[in-house]
């Protein structure tokens, strides 16, 4: 336990070790550690940002979806209305067409009736003459009686 | 071993391998007389004492420098391969030490000085490594040294006050340097003269108190570390004197206890160094 030159030797060794540590050991390792800390911090903040972005995107997507839904509903509504209109118009058309057809048919029937009546009228004179001949057993002068017959036919 | 009685055994284990200068006409242990002043290894504890200041504890210096080189070599090795990515096992260990020391400095030191943290790291790891040597059974290395012809051999540098005072004096010089640098000569003198009693009448008393407090710092640093390590060493030596079959019941618990003491003493020395230097940086 003697105090001697070892004391000075130890002090010198201590100084050299401290100097070496300050110069060659401390800086590279702390630099690497700080760089890693920064990397981790950056990564974390990036993750935060990403999650925020995701939230925004989700919100936007929900909005878009909502908008699309609304648009689709409007379209369907419109289409339904249009379809109803078309159906209505078709119905109207069909009805008009039907009426027209019926009208036509009626006219034709009327025409035929007139024609038949005229034909009948024409024949009635002959038939009446024939009938009268039979009854009278004589020939009737057609020319003499035609006036009367025509009057008769007109009464039919 | 060159020890027949317990007292000799203990004395032997507490004597350093000393290389020093014997004065002219000195009568050595074997009766021979030194013709002129010579540098030689001390053969007995008495010779080592008589060498006075002009002597070197080869074992203390050798082992402490070896531990310092081990520390710096290991850390420099890692520093060369350091990666910002996922650290490997060894880098992890080194970084844990760094973070530990950075934590101490951050908590205790309030100034800004790039020297403090590496200084604390050096002190902590170096003392830790020197203290750890204590866990090597006390007779292993001295026996080998003895076989190589070296009479005395102490492997734990921190059980030698020269080693602990060497460090604490280094710290003391730094305290003085930064006190003068930060506070200036007048500021530092004022601090010594007007604390704790701020009155001119108290200046002599203040000076006495403050200078004493200043000088006590390195002494307490060195003696605390030395005392703890030395006492532990003595207990190990005493245990080694017991019969072989009973030794393990005592030296195993004592060694386990030293697993606590070894880093604790390194930690205390480091923290106090940072505290003292922090005070040196505080300008009132």
Curated annotation (Swiss-Prot), chain A:
SUPFAM superfamilies: F1F0 ATP synthase subunit B, membrane domain
Chief site of localization: membrane
Alphabetized HAMAP family for the sequence: ATP_synth_b_bprime (MF_01398)
Keyword Membrane: yes
InterPro entries the UniProt entry points to: ATP_synth_B-like_membr_sf, ATP_synth_b/b'su_bac/chlpt, ATP_synth_F0_bsu_bac, ATP_synthase_B_chain
Organism: Marinobacter nauticus (strain ATCC 700491 / DSM 11845 / VT8)
Membrane topology: Single-pass membrane protein
Keyword Oxidoreductase part of the UniProt annotation: no
GO MF terms held by the record: proton-transporting ATP synthase activity, rotational mechanism; proton-transporting ATPase activity, rotational mechanism
Protein name per UniProt: ATP synthase subunit b
Alphabetical keyword list: ATP synthesis, Cell inner membrane, Cell membrane, CF(0), Hydrogen ion transport, Ion transport, Membrane, Transmembrane, Transmembrane helix, Transport
Record-linked Pfam families: ATP-synt_B (PF00430)
Chain's role: F(1)F(0) ATP synthase produces ATP from ADP in the presence of a proton or sodium gradient. F-type ATPases consist of two structural domains, F(1) containing the extramembraneous catalytic core and F(0) containing the membrane proton channel, linked together by a central stalk and a peripheral stalk. During catalysis, ATP synthesis in the catalytic domain of F(1) is coupled via a rotary mechanism of the central stalk subunits to proton translocation. Component of the F(0) channel, it forms part of the peripheral stalk, linking F(1) to F(0).
Gene that produces this protein: atpF
Curated annotation (Swiss-Prot), chain B:
Membrane topology qualifier: Multi-pass membrane protein
GO cellular component, one term: plasma membrane
Keyword Signal annotated: no
InterPro entries xrefs: ATP_syn_F0_a_bact/chloroplast, ATP_synth_F0_asu, ATP_synth_F0_asu_AS, F0_ATP_A_sf
GO terms, molecular function: proton-transporting ATP synthase activity, rotational mechanism
Subcellular location(s) per record: Cell inner membrane
Transmembrane segments: 55-75, 116-136, 165-185, 196-216, 234-254, 255-275
GO biological process: proton motive force-driven plasma membrane ATP synthesis
Keyword Transmembrane helix in record: yes
UniProt keyword terms in alphabetical order: ATP synthesis, Cell inner membrane, Cell membrane, CF(0), Hydrogen ion transport, Ion transport, Membrane, Transmembrane, Transmembrane helix, Transport
Chief location of this protein within or outside the cell: membrane
Subunit and interaction comment: F-type ATPases have 2 components, CF(1) - the catalytic core - and CF(0) - the membrane proton channel. CF(1) has five subunits: alpha(3), beta(3), gamma(1), delta(1), epsilon(1). CF(0) has three main subunits: a(1), b(2) and c(9-12). The alpha and beta chains form an alternating ring which encloses part of the gamma chain. CF(1) is attached to CF(0) by a central stalk formed by the gamma and epsilon chains, while a peripheral stalk is formed by the delta and b chains.
Similarity field: Belongs to the ATPase A chain family.
Role this protein plays: Key component of the proton channel; it plays a direct role in the translocation of protons across the membrane.
Protein's recorded name: ATP synthase subunit a
Organism from which the protein derives: Marinobacter nauticus (strain ATCC 700491 / DSM 11845 / VT8)
Lineage, top ranks: Bacteria, Pseudomonadati, Pseudomonadota, Gammaproteobacteria, Pseudomonadales
